[in-house]
């Protein structure tokens, strides 16, 4: 009996072990990933709705769209070979290769000026002797009207790449070209002036009398604010040098060197040397100058205006007349009773600050000897003004840029003639103004 019981016990044990083994064979073991998920699902607390929203926000901020960086526009290259310029079929390529301010090729409205190039081009650089009228560039399948701005130095980007362009002149006035060149597609290279139109509103509006006064007296100030602070500097010249057209080119070259990019405004007063304010007033009159100045002030709405020494620096009567009228024009520009027809076009403007060169009250000494970070050549405002004056070839030997405190040519000394925003505490002409806005 005992042996039978033992046998049954052995059989039952074997069966039990076999069953357990079978169960083990059919049970699927979780993978490592499944094990982790299972653990998280069993241990993590249930998220609230707020936590869910926060998670969604976090996830949304992490997911970003790919950023596509636009390649900068290339710098255009001058095409020096394989170019042919003809005027009514006559080759004038060599004459127009480089500007000579003492000569130009006259062109009548009935004539045809054409530029062709073996290398496709997308821009033209033109230097005119005098301000041109309207003209049209024409090529196979397209055209572009130009000349509305009247730029003497004009960089024109074409809407497509071409190999040949002809000029069609709109007016009966005579044209005269000093330089014409073709360029590949891109922004204007160094040495090519791509002027912007006169600005909408100016941070600084300077009122020099002649071409070169902007450099001699205001050059350090203009260079600093135009280059280092990248402010909008607009210039308005009282005289037009109608009998010395080369000085108009010198003016553009000097302004460009000082970092000015908005095309200058030029008045209609003739350049005429006078020895006193009264002599200048007898020649020009007061009202034409006042009206012109009020127009510029209301148009450009400057934060700061810069004018000549009331004594005319070295006694030039036109300098004196310019400033004598300017201090009145600043007041008139804010008064609706003065020149109301100009107010209808531009509105009124009360200029926050007016500085005059060498004015002794509320004096300021402007720093022209600090190297400008934004100047590629690492120059100071004084050095830039000196380089700009080199552009005034016709005036070489007469004057020079100076910071001699005992000289009437000193470009560092100014006085705050009028202010609506308080007096200066440092050497910054733009102090207390909303510069760059």
Model-derived regions, located:
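Bacterial N-terminal signal peptides that target proteins for export
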Residues: 1-10
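N-terminal intrinsically disordered, low-complexity tails enriched in polar/charged
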Residues: 4, 66-82
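Hydrophobic helical h-region of N-terminal Sec-dependent signal peptides
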Residues: 12-17
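C-terminal motif of bacterial Sec signal peptides marking the signal peptidase cleavage site
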Residues: 19-22
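N-terminal, intrinsically disordered, polar/charged segments of Gram-positive cell-envelope systems
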Residues: 26-72
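Long, contiguous interaction/targeting segments characteristic
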Residues: 63-69, 234-236, 397, 401-404, ...
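The feature marks non-catalytic terminal segments
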Residues: 75-106, 117, 128-130, 135, ...
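Active-site beta-strand->loop->alpha-helix modules in alpha/beta enzyme cores, enriched
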Residues: 79-87, 91-113, 119-123, 128-134, ...
């Amino acid at each position: 009996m005992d042996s039978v019981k033992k046998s049954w016990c052995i059989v039952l044990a074997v069966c039990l072990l076999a069953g357990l083994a079978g169960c083990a064979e059919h049970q699927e073991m979780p993978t490592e990933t499944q094990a982790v998920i299972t653990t998280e699902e069993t241990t993590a607390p249930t998220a609230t709705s707020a936590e869910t929203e926060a998670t969604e926000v976090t996830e949304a901020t992490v997911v970003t769209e790919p950023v596509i960086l636009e390649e900068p526009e290339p710098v255009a290259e001058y095409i020096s070979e394989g170019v042919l310029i003809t005027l009514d079929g006559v080759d004038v390529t060599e004459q127009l290769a480089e500007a000579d301010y003492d000569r130009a090729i006259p062109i009548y409205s009935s004539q045809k000026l054409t530029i062709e190039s073996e290398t496709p081009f997308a821009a033209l650089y033109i230097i005119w002797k005098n301000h041109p009228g309207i003209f049209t560039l024409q090529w196979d399948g397209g055209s572009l009207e130009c000349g509305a701005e009247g730029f003497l130095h004009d960089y024109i980007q074409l809407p497509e790449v071409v190999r040949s362009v002809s000029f069609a002149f709109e007016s009966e006035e005579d044209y005269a070209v000093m330089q014409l060149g073709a360029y590949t597609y891109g922004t204007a290279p160094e040495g090519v002036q791509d002027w912007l139109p006169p600005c909408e509103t100016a941070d600084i509006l300077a009122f020099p009398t002649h071409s070169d006064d902007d450099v001699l007296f205001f050059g350090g100030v203009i260079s600093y604010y135009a280059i280092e602070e990248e402010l909008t500097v607009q210039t308005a010249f009282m005289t037009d040098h109608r009998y010395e057209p080369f000085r108009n080119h010198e003016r553009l070259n000097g302004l460009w060197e000082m970092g000015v990019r908005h095309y200058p405004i030029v008045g209609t007063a003739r350049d005429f040397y006078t020895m006193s304010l009264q002599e200048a007033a007898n020649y020009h009159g007061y009202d034409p100058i006042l009206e012109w100045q009020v127009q510029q002030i209301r148009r450009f709405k400057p934060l700061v205006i810069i004018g000549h020494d009331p004594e005319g620096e070295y006694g030039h009567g036109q300098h004196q007349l310019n400033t004598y009228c300017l201090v009145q024009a600043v007041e008139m520009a804010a008064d609706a009773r003065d020149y109301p027809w100009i107010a209808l076009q531009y509105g009124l403007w009360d200029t926050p600050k007016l500085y005059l060169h060498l004015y002794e009250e509320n004096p300021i000494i402007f720093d022209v000897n600090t190297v400008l970070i934004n100047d590629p050549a690492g120059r100071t405002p004084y050095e830039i003004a000196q380089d700009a004056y080199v552009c005034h070839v016709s005036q070489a030997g007469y004057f020079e840029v100076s910071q001699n405190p005992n000289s009437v040519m000193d470009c560092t000394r100014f006085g705050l003639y009028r202010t609506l925003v308080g007096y200066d505490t440092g050497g910054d002409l733009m102090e207390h103004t909303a510069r760059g806005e």
